Swiss-Prot record:
<dbReference type="GO" id="GO:0003735">
    <property type="term" value="F:structural constituent of ribosome"/>
</dbReference>
<keyword id="KW-0687">Ribonucleoprotein</keyword>
<protein>
    <recommendedName>
        <fullName>Large ribosomal subunit protein bL34</fullName>
    </recommendedName>
</protein>
<comment type="similarity">
    <text>Belongs to the bacterial ribosomal protein bL34 family.</text>
</comment>
<dbReference type="InterPro" id="IPR000271">
    <property type="entry name" value="Ribosomal_bL34"/>
</dbReference>
<dbReference type="GO" id="GO:1990904">
    <property type="term" value="C:ribonucleoprotein complex"/>
</dbReference>
<dbReference type="GO" id="GO:0006412">
    <property type="term" value="P:translation"/>
</dbReference>
<keyword id="KW-0689">Ribosomal protein</keyword>
<dbReference type="InterPro" id="IPR020939">
    <property type="entry name" value="Ribosomal_bL34_CS"/>
</dbReference>
<dbReference type="Pfam" id="PF00468">
    <property type="entry name" value="Ribosomal_L34"/>
</dbReference>
<dbReference type="GO" id="GO:0005840">
    <property type="term" value="C:ribosome"/>
</dbReference>
């Protein structure tokens, strides 16, 4: 049985564009995510 290709193809540029800090700061919900992660004391806030 043939399996498909691996779905995770790492790409740092796309990672930052989709989950990055600048993107998070753009929307109200995104800012809420960063605030929540800061409050929780996360080492890494975004990608």
């Amino acid at each position: 049985m043939a399996k498909g290709k691996r779905t995770f193809q790492p790409n740092n540029r796309r990672r930052a564009k989709v989950h990055g800090f600048r993107l998070r700061m753009r929307t109200r919900a995104g800012r809420a995510i960063v605030t929540a992660r800061r409050a929780k004391g996360r080492r890494s806030l975004t990608a």
